[in-house]
């Protein structure tokens, strides 16, 4: 029975992740481009008044292109297909990634329920942290290839590397260690997962006791139940992303080809000194636009499949 439950969570997690990845891929590409240090900054001139002789001083400056500007640039120079760059390795990675995550989450929750107060916040955070650690450690090479493909800029019509070619290039130029660039930043991002699932499980428990849940048994869930879970997942991910977003920027910088960014704290220091603290939130808007519906789709699909395929409780 335990093995069957694990397989169910593996399957449900893989399906949820696949659906979410396909539907939100263009926003993933936009977010990665905005996070990158290779983003072209638009030059501006700042006028500073109040000098000793009363004259103004014109200082050169720069403005980070917005979401729509980056989207327009990609469509004009690279074509609409570039909005799906990295989808191949993303699909190859997201199904096993989500499958591993949800299977590890459900199993670790069983274990932690026997150690701490059952279904408490500590249990949810510990389970989410453990599952994220396992998933990040196993899947980082695939996410590394996906990020490199999304950062590759080629004019419309120019041949671009596929996932296998990109993986070979990374291995040839950087060796096996190259596939694990950004892993420390991914570990730092475990805090985001812990916050997200703490909020989600809390809201899920509240919804189970509220008017959104049908008054019948757990096996008679209606559309309103899953709609409520989608809103809970969206809210949880939005809060967690805003709190822990800087690690995403650091991770993208660490995965850039031939970059000056070598280690987590060295990268954080360089970004802060050279670009200011606002740079840690570059790409936040497309991240929220992508991650909120993506998480809502993934979790609600996962919950739906588990509900449909799980054996009725006696």
Swiss-Prot record:
UniProt record, GO biological process: mitochondrial genome maintenance; pyrimidine nucleotide import into mitochondrion
UniProt superkingdom: Eukaryota
GO MF: pyrimidine nucleotide transmembrane transporter activity
A Pfam short name: Mito_carr
Intervals holding Solcar repeats: 4-111, 119-206, 224-308
Membrane-protein topology: Multi-pass membrane protein
Entry's Gene Ontology cellular component terms: mitochondrial inner membrane; mitochondrion
Transmembrane segment boundaries: 7-27, 44-58, 114-134, 183-203, 226-246, 291-311
Annotated keywords: Membrane, Mitochondrion, Mitochondrion inner membrane, Repeat, Transmembrane, Transmembrane helix, Transport
Compartment(s) of residence: Mitochondrion inner membrane
Family the UniProt entry places it in: Belongs to the mitochondrial carrier (TC 2.A.29) family.
Biological function: Mitochondrial transporter that imports/exports pyrimidine nucleotides into and from mitochondria which participates in dendritic cell endocytosis.
PANTHER family referenced in this protein's UniProt entry, alphabetically: MITOCHONDRIAL CARRIER PROTEIN RIM2, SOLUTE CARRIER FAMILY 25 MEMBER 33
Name used for this protein in its record: Solute carrier family 25 member 33
Organism whose genome encodes this protein: Danio rerio
